[in-house]
Amino acid sequence: MVEKKVKYSCIQSLKDAGAPVIIVTLPEEAEAIANACRDNGITVSAFCDNETRKSSKLFCGLEVFHTPTLPKRFPKARFIIAYYNIQECVEQLSALGYDEFYSPLELLENYDVSKYQHRISQSYMKTRISVWKKSHELYFDEAKIYLRSLDVMITTKCSLKCESCANLMQY
């Protein structure tokens, strides 16, 4: 069992004085997370992302840093993981010397999409948040293992003879 380093309860901890708060990665949901932080009195200092092209412009009025460069600018920081793959972010940031991670699930529990004008349509944002929430909820569910995708490779000739089969070795 992998140790869970990400905390579910975040609002009070992030409101308290401490290291800067940074939102990790820039999926469309990051905009909703930034809005929810403002609604809850949490000051976000910046965003970070692994794609250098995203760090060349502002997002939601805040600077975006290339993740590997964070330690130069922020020796200590608290991170809100906006990415669907929480563990991947935690591993990368832990390797950079960080140890304070939060899921924004608590922030988005009562988030009202219709209250804001997003960069994408309201219905699409609502759907994105719904799917995103499921991946974060599964991270905290001890009874389940979350796999975002699963590749199946058939290595022998299939004998099912399905009518609409796309397998190259069908029959």
Residue ranges: model-predicted function:
Residues 1-135:
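Hydrophobic, well-ordered beta-alpha structural blocks that scaffold small-molecule cofactor pockets
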Residues 20, 76, 141, 149-152:
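A general structural-boundary detector
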Residues 129-147:
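Short, charged low-complexity linear segments at domain edges
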Residues 144-171:
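Canonical Radical SAM [4Fe-4S] cluster-binding loop centered on the CxxxCxxC motif
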